[in-house]
């Protein structure tokens, strides 16, 4: 088995999908998890205005609405959370995503004071934080807020990790990589886009340039620039297609580099890192 085949196997990616089937499968999965865990009544998810959180949020709201109708239990709720750092440049996209999702509840927590306070505390201790690491603090602070909300609201936190993100390790460890349930796992970027099209999302929500937008000094830095490879190449690779040797080498480099993010903290019994 080639490395490409092994990665595809691990991430469960299909070469082609039926978007309607995947929508139904995901909604049923989200419903089943809450039914199995009777102490949970809500899903919590940060909404950025990008493709991934828009899709995960819409599917979560659909699942919650169906659960309420099927059980008569009005305690089932989907809580969308806006988590800007100061003023978000593409706030209009976030509001467009919220209008599409139509969440039961929307909370807004501005993380700027918490992030800046942490950076200042570190500086006071003599630790200077790079702009890149400050970006990771932002991602982790967003999860702190989401887990606080989930803890108070009998909730589970939804993550937006999907195959094209997982293969590159393009997420912050214990930040956006920390979640309870991953409804988009197995889908690549273009497949997620296909689901949004079927769901009737505004094209602007899935055609915009993907960006983590974590660094102050590189606002709106495109994912593809940061990774040095296009999502088209990543998606083709995940669908078992041939791509250029340069693109393949870049993708596989990120796969190896990000292995630690796909595992629980390393113990003496682990050998994947050797």
Curated annotation (Swiss-Prot):
GO BP: NAD biosynthetic process
EC code: 6.3.1.5
A Gene Ontology molecular function term of the record: NAD+ synthase (glutamine-hydrolyzing) activity
Record field: catalytic activity: deamido-NAD(+) + NH4(+) + ATP = AMP + diphosphate + NAD(+) + H(+)
Known pathway: Cofactor biosynthesis; NAD(+) biosynthesis; NAD(+) from deamido-NAD(+) (ammonia route): step 1/1
Alphabetized NCBIfam families for the sequence: nadE, PRK00768.1
Family (UniProt): Belongs to the NAD synthetase family.
Subunit: Homodimer.
UniProt protein name: NH(3)-dependent NAD(+) synthetase
Source species: Streptococcus pyogenes serotype M5 (strain Manfredo)
């Amino acid at each position: 088995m080639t490395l490409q085949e092994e990665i595809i196997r691990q991430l469960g990616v299909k070469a082609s999908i039926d978007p309607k089937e995947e929508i139904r499968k995901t909604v049923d999965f989200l419903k089943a998890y809450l039914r199995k865990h009777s102490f949970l009544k809500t899903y919590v998810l940060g909404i950025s205005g990008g493709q991934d959180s828009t899709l995960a949020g819409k599917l979560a709201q659909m699942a919650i609405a169906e659960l309420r109708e099927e059980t008569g239990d009005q305690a089932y709720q989907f809580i969308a959370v806006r988590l800007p750092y100061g003023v978000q440049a593409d706030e209009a996209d976030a509001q467009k995503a919220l209008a599409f999702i139509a969440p039961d509840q929307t909370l807004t927590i501005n993380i700027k004071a918490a992030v800046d306070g942490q950076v200042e505390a570190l500086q006071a201790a003599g630790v200077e934080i790079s702009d890149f690491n400050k970006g990771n603090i932002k991602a982790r602070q967003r999860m702190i807020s989401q887990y606080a909300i989930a803890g108070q609201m009998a909730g589970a936190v939804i993550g937006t990790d999907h195959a094209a993100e997982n293969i590159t390790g393009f997420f912050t460890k214990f930040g956006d990589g920390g979640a309870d349930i991953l409804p988009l796992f197995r889908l690549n970027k273009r497949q997620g886009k296909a689901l949004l099209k079927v769901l009737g999302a505004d094209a602007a929500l899935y055609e915009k340039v993907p960006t983590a937008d974590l660094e102050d000094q590189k606002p709106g830095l495109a994912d593809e620039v940061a990774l040095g490879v296009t999502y088209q190449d990543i998606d083709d690779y995940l669908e078992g297609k041939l791509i250029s040797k340069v693109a393949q080498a870049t993708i596989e480099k990120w796969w190896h580099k990000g292995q630690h993010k796909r595992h629980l903290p390393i113990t003496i019994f682990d050998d994947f890192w050797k």
